[in-house]
Amino acid sequence: MAHQLRFAAAREPISEEYPAVALPHPRCISVAFPPPRFTPSPSPLTNYSFLAALTPQELEMRLQIAMDVQMISKLDQRKLQTMASLLTSDPDYFLMIARNMNGSKRIQKLLGKTDDVDALFAAAILRRFLHIITDKYASYVVRRGMTVFDKKKKKAMYEHILHYASHIARDKHGNLALNDIITDAYRNKLFDVIAHKALVLSNDAYGNFVIQRVLKLNDLRSKNNIVVSLRGHFVDLSFQKYGSYVVDVLLETKESMVVVVEELMECEGDMLMRLARNEYGNFLVCKALRVTQKEMVRTDLFWGLVHKLKPFHNLLRWSRGKNIASILNSIR
């Protein structure tokens, strides 16, 4: 059940207890465990009962005027508080504003002004978190919040990010937002979630970019966790467009390269031949030969691949595997 923020009486002290905010879920998204709960601090607002007397048209006009960028920069603390209250008191209205390009920019300008204003916006963001972080323009509000919010609010945001990480990473706009904040203080926890979902993400049009980003950070612990999650699936991934991108990155460092090549050598000869002629796999088999030939510490890997591929040399010459055939020719 979503909770509405109440407007406190004039000079009412800040209370540390605050109703928990539960998030609605978009259609077609199943969440196996309950969303994280957030207990933001309420803000000491002056009496805004006059808002109830405004017609919808008057309220809309006030909001349009208030959202002017130049006016935002001139607002005092009380007017900022009024502005934030108008924008955040209705979750759906806030979402509508945040999804608008200009609305998103203006909300971002309001963030980081005062802690009380930030408390209102943090609560509003968390009520519609998944909708906001996966939107083209609204996602920038989350990114800005993760830059200017205090530790308590950032922690609440990160709990939601961790909870929805798999959904966010597979969204066109969400994965870009995730990439922007992936190096923050909670990155190890986020990396653990990503590694756990590595197989699903590797096969996804957008999720594979998140896996690539984590791998390229060269965080040994996270890379090992991803390799463990993907072990036994490298051949299957190599046949797929998005999965092949991930395998390509894994072939670039010695430790992960060894695991991938060993798995290639374990597959049946016919399977390796099909991979070598595959639209995506041929490039990876060729790269595996090149990196193992260059890294002669494990000569057994290079010669193992050569011996498995040689029987198919003629088939490879007249297919997508012609570059592989050229390598085999060069070592005769």
Curated annotation (Swiss-Prot):
Record's subcellular location: Cytoplasm
Any GO BP annotation: regulation of translation
Keyword list, A-Z: Cytoplasm, Repeat, RNA-binding, Translation regulation
Cellular component terms per the entry's GO annotation: cytoplasm
Signal peptide: none
Pfam families: PUF
Pumilio repeats: 89-124, 125-159, 160-191, 192-228, 229-266, 267-303
Gene3D superfamilies: Leucine-rich Repeat Variant (1.25.10.10)
Keyword Transit peptide among record annotations: no
Domain PUM-HD: 1-332
Keyword set includes RNA-binding: yes
One term of GO molecular function: mRNA binding
UniProt remark on domains: The pumilio repeats mediate the association with RNA by packing together to form a right-handed superhelix that approximates a half donut. The number as well as the specific sequence of the repeats determine the specificity for target mRNAs.
PANTHER family in the record: PUMILIO HOMOLOG 18-RELATED, RNA BINDING PROTEIN PUMILIO-RELATED
Function: Sequence-specific RNA-binding protein that regulates translation and mRNA stability by binding the 3'-UTR of target mRNAs.
Protein name: Putative pumilio homolog 20
Gene source species: Arabidopsis thaliana
Lineage: Eukaryota, Viridiplantae, Streptophyta, Embryophyta, Tracheophyta
